[in-house]
From Swiss-Prot:
One of its GO terms (molecular function) is aspartic-type endopeptidase activity. Residues 25-29, 87-92, 156-312 are extracellular. It is a multi-pass membrane protein. This is Preflagellin peptidase. Cleaves the N-terminal leader peptide from preflagellins. Its main location: membrane. PANTHER family: PREFLAGELLIN PEPTIDASE (PTHR36506:SF1).
């Protein structure tokens, strides 16, 4: 396969995004250092292309290049940042899309060892490659709930949550990523975030098994420790986080109850949810006191719950990048097929 040196160097992104997608599935966390070398490479290659085009023979090519780069940088980057601000993207997802906007503003070209065949096969009229990656990522993401539903159907699992989740035994919940799809009132897409659950358990120094063993006592604010633990970030212990399954500092008998006496107004705070969220110096992934209370109520009553692992967005992004580099723009092809492009 042949191409320009900048386009060949851009292929370094494929294994990097593949590794990031794997990390997203396994840990839901991608280190910031993953993107730094690739971002530096992206800037260098963009300047390289700009110099090549600017010293080229035609002004038309220069204008097209500038327009496409302007769309990529001026639309995809703000869009990614906006989705991150409203919670639609995680931090790693937003950084990855911003990187795509700089690394792939225009279509790369890779010539195969066959006459007149070059990848990507299907290009768009606008010619902004980062938009192609974005649209292919969205299409790949649409497949996810269909695959989840098919898996649940094959296992005989029927529920309102079957398109976005799967059932998990409650004792195993703290070893999962995602959020509960249940509240005391039934199906609820806005259930408790499991990272926030791990933070809460770490903060109060007990395991979910301890909570389930004596829910009536643990629900009382007087059962909270006077000196809570650092809640951490809710990551699993195998990913470098603090364990939320019992390997934490249990409060002593002298610690329990003292704070409840000092804060009589907290008596109407089941599970100490408000105190937990007031005590930590950062957000517990947007969790409200009521979400935490409802989630704990479900977890002490049920033996199995439905959870949504969420879409590890770097996975469809990696798939979208690979499809974009080989086939091209799937959405554009579909629109052409129905006469809309």
């Amino acid at each position: 396969m042949l191409g320009s040196i900048p386009d060949l160097l851009r292929l370094v992104a494929v294994p990097v995004f593949g590794w990031a997608a794997y990390r997203d599935v396994k840990t839901r966390r991608v280190p910031n250092r993953t993107w730094t070398p690739l971002a530096a490479l992206a800037v260098v290659l963009l300047l390289w292309d700009a110099y090549t085009v600017w010293t080229g023979p035609t002004a038309v090519g220069q204008r097209l290049f500038l327009i496409r780069v302007a769309i990529s940088l001026g639309f995809v980057i703000p869009l990614s940042y906006g989705f991150w601000l409203i919670g639609g993207f995680g931090g790693a997802d937003a950084k990855a899309f911003m990187l795509i906007a700089v690394l792939f503003p225009i279509y790369p070209v890779y010539y195969l060892p066959m006459p007149s065949v070059a990848l990507p096969l299907q290009q768009t009229a606008i010619g902004v490659f980062s938009l192609t990656v974005l649209s292919n990522t969205v299409l790949a993401g649409v497949v996810y709930p269909l695959a989840v539903a098919a898996g649940n159907l094959a296992r005989g699992r029927f529920s309102l949550a079957m398109f976005i989740g799967r059932p998990v035994a409650v004792p195993d919940v703290t070893e999962e990523y995602g959020r509960l799809l249940e509240s005391p009132d039934g199906f609820d897409r806005g259930g408790l975030d499991l990272d926030a659950l791990r933070m809460y358990l770490q903060w109060r120094g007990c395991s979910l098994a301890d909570i389930r063993a004596d829910p009536a006592q643990r629900r009382l604010p007087t059962s909270l420790p006077a000196v809570p633990n650092d809640p951490g970030d809710g990551s699993l212990a195998t990913d470098g986080g603090d364990s939320a399954s019992g390997d934490v500092a249990e409060p002593s008998a002298n610690d329990i109850g003292a704070d409840g006496m000092d804060h009589p107004d907290q008596i109407d705070d089941p599970w100490g949810a408000e105190r937990f969220l007031d005590d930590i110096d950062h957000s517990a992934y947007g969790t409200s006191p009521q979400q935490l209370r409802d989630g704990l109520d479900v977890l002490v009553e049920q033996d199995e719950v439905w959870i949504s692992p969420g879409i590890p967005f770097l996975v469809p992004m990696f798939a979208g990048l690979v499809v974009s580099l080989t086939y091209g723009d799937v959405l554009f092809s579909l629109l052409q097929a129905v006469g809309l492009a």
